[in-house]
Amino acid sequence: MANSHKTDDLDHFDLKILEALSEDGRMSVLQLSKRVGLSKTPCQTRLKRLVDEGYILGFRAVLNPQKLGVDHIAFAEVKLSDTREKALEEFNTAVRKIKEVEECHMIAGAFDYLLKVRTSDIRKYRRVLGEKISSLPSVSNTSTFVVMQSVKETGI
C-alpha cells in the first residue's frame, strides 16, 4: 500500500504535518493542528490517514550517541563473492542481526553494500569488522571510511 503513493497525492496540509512531526514526533495533535493551521479533528484524521497509508512508518526517540558512548561512526564498503539472489538474501538476513550496523544499503557500483557502523571507538569497530562483518555470508572484501565529524544527520 505505501509503495503505491507519491508525494503528489499529498496536499500542503499533509506535507506540513509530515514536516512538523519529522522535527518533533512527540507534539500533541492540538499542537500539531495549531502549527499546520487546521482544527484538531481534521488534523487528527489526516494524521491517522498518513499513518494508515504508510507515509509515517512510526515514531521514535532521537538518542544522543555521545551520551550513550557510541559516537564513533565508520562506513564500510562490502564486496560479496557471490551476488546471486540466495547469497544476497543470506547477507541481508545476517547483517540485520548486527546491532552495531545502523544502516545497510545495497549499492550499484564497485562494491555491493555500504554499511553505517556505530561503535564506542576504533578498537570496538575493528572487532565488529573482524568478527561480525567480515564473517557475513559471501563477504570477500571490505573497505572502511572513518567519520571525523558528523556535519548533518537527519531522517527525511
Swiss-Prot record:
Tell me which InterPro entries the record gives. Answer: ArsR-like_HTH, AsnC-type_HTH_dom, Dimeric_a/b-barrel, Tscrpt_reg_AsnC-like, Tscrpt_reg_AsnC/Lrp_C, Tscrpt_reg_HTH_AsnC-type_CS, WH-like_DNA-bd_sf, WH_DNA-bd_sf
Tell me which Gene Ontology terms the entry assigns under biological process.
Answer: alanine catabolic process; response to L-leucine
Q: Does the keyword Ribosomal protein apply?
A: no
Q: Identify the GO cellular component terms for this protein.
A: cytosol
Keywords of the record:
Activator, DNA-binding, Plasmid, Transcription, Transcription regulation
Q: Which domain of life is it from?
A: Bacteria
Molecular-function GO terms, alphabetical: sequence-specific DNA binding
- UniProt-listed SMART domains: HTH_ASNC (SM00344)
DNA-binding residues: 29-48
Where's the HTH asnC-type domain? 10-71
> What job does the chain carry out?
Transcriptional activator of the putA gene in response to proline.
The name this protein carries in UniProt is Proline dehydrogenase transcriptional activator
Q: Which organism is it from?
A: Rhizobium radiobacter (Agrobacterium tumefaciens)
